[in-house]
UniProtKB/Swiss-Prot annotation:
Residues annotated as domain EF-hand: 746-781, 787-822
Residues that bind Ca(2+): D759, D761, S763, T765, E770
Name of protein: Alpha-actinin-1
Keywords: Acetylation, Actin-binding, Calcium, Cell junction, Cell membrane, Cell projection, Cytoplasm, Cytoskeleton, Disease variant, Membrane, Metal-binding, Phosphoprotein, Repeat
Region annotation Interaction with DDN: where it falls in the sequence: 274-733
Spectrin repeat residues: 274-384, 394-499, 509-620, 630-733
List of residues that carry N-acetylmethionine: M1
Location in the cell: Cytoplasm, Cytoskeleton; Cytoplasm, Myofibril, Sarcomere, Z line; Cell membrane; Cell junction
Assembly mode: Homodimer; antiparallel. Interacts with MYOZ2, TTID and LPP. Interacts with DDN. Interacts with PSD. Interacts with MICALL2. Interacts with DNM2 and CTTN. Interacts with PDLIM1. Interacts with PDLIM2. Interacts with PDLIM4 (via PDZ domain). Interacts with IGSF8.
Residue numbers of N6-acetyllysine PTMs: K95, K195, K676
Predominant location: cytoplasm
GO cellular component: brush border; cell junction; cell projection; cell-cell junction; cortical actin cytoskeleton; cytoplasm; cytosol; extracellular exosome
SUPFAM superfamilies membership: Calponin-homology domain, CH-domain, EF-hand, Spectrin repeat
């Protein structure tokens, strides 16, 4: 702190002469003090319904000065003088100054006359003295007071805020953050402190002044512009304004403390009243529950059944487990609440709580003791009754269990013993029934002990006077009667089963013999029927003769088969005789086979019917095979002549196409003679087609008399026609090429010789490698380097545009003719158009129509693009691009 700060801190109540000199040194301070002191005075005078406008004028008569002192001190001053004379005014001011002096304040150099005369310095000094005495002197923080106390209070309140460092009452407040921090510390909802900036003091100061005036009832005692524009704000003005914050916030804190004290007292009283109500209700509920429970525990009427007594025990357990524990907790909580309530009343100087009559803790303890005494006796009675009934219930349950097991075992046994299932059973079933019956007899003997135990238990229950003895006796008697009846039925069933077994054993032997002989005979008949009905497929006379021989051998075995059939039927008749004699009720058929006599007779009759049908079918097939053989021979004779003829013609045409005898016209004439002879041969092909149609209708699939099929003949004939036509066309094209390109016969022969030389397989085409070798032989320089490969690829694209991988002789001739003959080019056509155009770079539609035929002129006009050169005229056409397009060098 600088020297000025130290002086101000130690001498805040310094004589007026000192602060008078300070005031004269800085007019800005005087301005700040006038505004601040005026606002401070008005903040108190408004409580009396008045205010001042000019601090040195409005206090001159002493009336408002006395009123100000009465407001801030809360005391009454002497009655003021109401006169308007100077003496009256001085008297009133002196009364005010005397009151100030009575408060222990020394007034040095301040006289009533200066105040009445409107001396600004003296008036401000007097007001500052009043502010120090009534607004600042009583401030006390820890061991400091007055100015030091106010400064310490500001430092404590603003300590948590960034960029706030209060060290004095002048420059520490220039940025306005100190005022904003004081407001935010006590009323954080009024200012968003986080948005404030230290470099914007005007906004900070105005924000604090506006908020303090609007929400804290602290008048605006300072101007933000004066504080910011002054190097050192007036300390007295700042202290006066800050003291208003102190009193505003300290008053609010006192009110809050008083309200908290009242709320605390009321809360304690309300809590005690609630505890009293809770005790009364809890005590009433607990006593009512005890009153209802004791009669239930005193009821000792015994039950006849164990179930009923167990239900009572279960109810008692529920009482112990579910109902009583919460009540024990309630009783304990009741005592705790009572003791807690009494303690709280005693600590808060309230009278002790006295519950309603009959609801004292001792009353509840007495009722609870009665409950537990009755409860103990009830539990002993329950256990004794349960032990008493337990023994009877055990015997009764044992009787019921054994009786139920026995009845479940005997259920259906009488019906089983009475049934006559053996009358329709097979031998194996009879043996199984006997085994089953023996097992039942063993089981019956084992159940004898249980029947005796049931009777003994029933006797004991009667002796113990069981309450339900009549039903036990009736059930026991029924079991004994049923047991005697089961014994008689068991013996009767055994006798019937043994008698039936003997008869069925005899029948079973006959069934077995029948099955052993019927099965192979049935298989023989089924095989015979399959063979007789088998659809045979033969293609030769030898095959049908073999089938006929096998059929005759089969017919020779039929007499012996008929004897076996009669023997098998005799066995079945013997079984029928035994069944009729002894009245055996057969439940099923022969267990060893499913073949019946009716089935044997039916199949035998079917075999006898199929034999003559087979004879007829074999005879008809033999005649058909003889006819087919004649067709084979007829077709073979013709095919063996036509096939070689076609092959010969194909070879002759091939020789003509590659030989170089005579001119091309001679070759063409020779080929046309061949074509005529081939056409004249067509009737023989048609006749062969007719014979082939007959063979197909007869379903003949092979022919040992020839190696030629109709398909071979057709393919050969079509190839022959195609070959002669293609060869004639090739020769005609060669003639056209020769004439158009001016190729001599010698050149044509040379080309043919070279082509034939490299056509190793005589296919009429050259592969890429063969074609390359042919070109080299003709003098073309085609190497294996990249340039040579590119040249050969170009040539191949010309001779094989479809990329088939072969070069025909015609393509070879076309290529060679282009290479050796003079042909039209795009340049020649352009030169011709230039002549028609009069040596211009374009041509007009009129010129085209004048020089060319109409259709060709219109063709050119439709396809020529407009000419766009610098010498163009309306309607000019570009004949140059048209000419290049004709030869594929550009798009048409």
């Amino acid at each position: 702190m600088d020297h000025y700060d130290s002086q101000q801190t130690n001498d805040y109540m310094q004589p007026e002469e000192d602060w008078d000199r300070d005031l004269l040194l800085d007019p800005a301070w005087e301005k700040q003090q006038r505004k601040t002191f005026t606002a401070w005075c008005n903040s108190h005078l408004r409580k009396a319904g008045t205010q001042i406008e000019n601090i040195e004028e409005d206090f001159r008569d002493g009336l408002k000065l006395m009123l100000l002192l009465e407001v801030i001190s809360g005391e009454r001053l002497a009655k003021p003088e109401r006169g308007k004379m100077r003496v009256h005014k001085i008297s009133n001011v002196n009364k005010a100054l005397d009151f100030i002096a009575s408060k222990g304040v020394k007034l040095v150099s301040i006289g009533a006359e200066e105040i009445v005369d409107g001396n600004v310095k003296m008036t401000l000094g007097m007001i500052w003295t009043i502010i120090l005495r009534f607004a600042i002197q009583d401030i006390s923080v820890e061991e400091t007071s007055a100015k030091e106390g106010l400064l310490l209070w500001c430092q404590r309140k603003t300590a948590p805020y960034k960029n706030v460092n209060i060290q004095n009452f002048h420059i520490s407040w220039k940025d306005g953050l100190g005022f904003c921090a004081l407001i935010h510390r006590h009323r954080p909802e009024l200012i968003d402190y986080g948005k404030l900036r230290k470099d914007d003091p005007l906004t900070n100061l105005n924000t604090a002044f506006d908020v303090a005036e609007k929400y804290l009832d602290i008048p605006k005692m300072l101007d933000a512009e004066d504080i910011v524009g002054t190097a050192r704000p007036d300390e007295k003005a700042i202290m006066t304004y800050v003291s208003s914050f102190y009193h505003a916030f300290s008053g609010a804190q006192k009110a809050e403390t008083a309200a908290n004290r009242i709320c605390k007292v009321l809360a304690v009283n309300q809590e005690n009243e609630q505890l009293m109500e809770d005790y009364e209700k809890l005590a009433s509920d607990l006593l009512e529950w005890i009153r209802r429970t004791i009669p239930w525990l005193e009821n000792r009427v015994p039950e006849n059944t164990m179930h009923a007594m167990q239900q009572k025990l279960e109810d008692f357990r529920d009482y112990r487990r579910l109902h009583k524990p919460p009540k024990v907790q309630e009783k304990c909580q009741l005592e705790i609440n009572f003791n807690t309530l009494q303690t709280k009343l005693r600590l808060s100087n309230r009278p002790a709580f006295m519950p309603s009559e009959g609801r004292m803790v001792s009353d509840i303890n007495n009722a609870w003791g009665c409950l537990e005494q009755v409860e103990k006796g009830y539990e002993e009675w329950l256990l004794n009754e349960i032990r008493r009934l337990e023994r009877l219930d055990h015997l009764a349950e044992k009787f019921r269990q054994k009786a139920s097991i026995h009845e479940a075992w005997t259920d259906g046994k009488e019906a089983m013993l009475r049934q006559k299932d053996y009358e329709t059973a097979t031998l194996s079933e009879i043996k199984a029934l006997l085994k089953k019956h023996e097992a039942f007899e063993s089981d019956l003997a084992a159940h004898q002990d249980r029947v005796e135990q049931i009777a003994a238990i029933a006797q004991e229950l009667n002796e113990l006077d069981y309450y339900d003895s009549p039903s036990v006796n009736a059930r026991c008697q029924k079991i004994c009667d049923q047991w005697d009846n089961l014994g008689a039925l068991t013996q009767k069933r055994r006798e019937a089963l043994e008698r039936t077994e003997k008869l069925l054993e005899t029948i079973d032997q006959l069934y077995l013999e029948y099955a052993k002989r019927a099965a192979p005979f049935n298989n023989w008949m089924e095989g015979a029927m399959e063979d007789l009905q088998d659809t045979f497929i033969v293609h030769t006379i030898e095959e049908i003769q073999g089938l006929t021989t096998a059929h005759e051998q089969f017919k020779a075995t039929l007499p012996d088969a008929d004897k076996e059939r009669l023997a098998i039927l005799g066995i079945h008749n013997e079984v029928s005789k035994i069944v009729q004699t002894y009245h055996v009720n057969m439940a099923g058929t022969n267990p060893y086979t499913t073949i019946t006599p009716q089935e044997i007779n039916g199949k035998w009759d079917h075999v006898r019917q199929l034999v003559p049908r087979r004879d007829q079918a074999l005879t008809e097939e033999h005649a058909r095979q003889q006819h087919n053989e004649r067709l084979r021979k007829q077709f073979g004779a013709q095919a063996n002549v036509i096939g070689p003829w076609i092959q010969t013609k194909m070879e002759e045409i091939g020789r003509i196409s590659i030989e170089m005898h005579g001119t091309l016209e001679d070759q063409l004439s020779h080929l046309r003679q061949y074509e005529k002879s081939i056409v004249n041969y067509k009737p023989k092909i048609d006749q062969l087609e007719g014979d082939h149609q007959l063979i197909q209708e007869a379903l003949i699939f092979d022919n040992k008399h020839t190696n030629y099929t109709m398909e071979h003949i057709r393919v050969g004939w079509e190839q022959l026609l195609t070959t002669i036509a293609r060869t004639i066309n090739e020769v005609e094209n060669q003639i056209l090429t020769r004439d158009a390109k001016g190729i001599s016969q010698e050149q044509m022969n040379e080309f043919r010789a070279s082509f034939n030389h490299f056509d190793r397989d005589h296919s009429g085409t050259l592969g890429p490698e063969e074609f390359k070798a042919c070109l080299i032989s003709l003098g073309y320089d085609i190497g294996n380097d990249p340039q040579g490969e590119a040249e050969f690829a170009r040539i191949m694209s010309i001779v094989d545009p479809n990329r088939l991988g072969v070069v025909t002789f015609q393509a070879f001739i076309d290529f060679m003719s282009r290479e050796t003959a003079d042909t039209d080019t795009a340049d020649q056509v352009m030169a011709s158009f230039k002549i028609l155009a009069g040596d211009k770079n374009y041509i007009t539609m009129d010129e085209l129509r004048r020089e060319l035929p109409p259709d060709q002129a219109e063709y050119c006009i439709a396809r020529m693009a407009p000419y766009t050169g610098p010498d163009s005229v309306p309607g000019a056409l570009d004949y140059m691009s048209f000419s290049t397009a004709l030869y594929g060098e550009s798009d048409l």
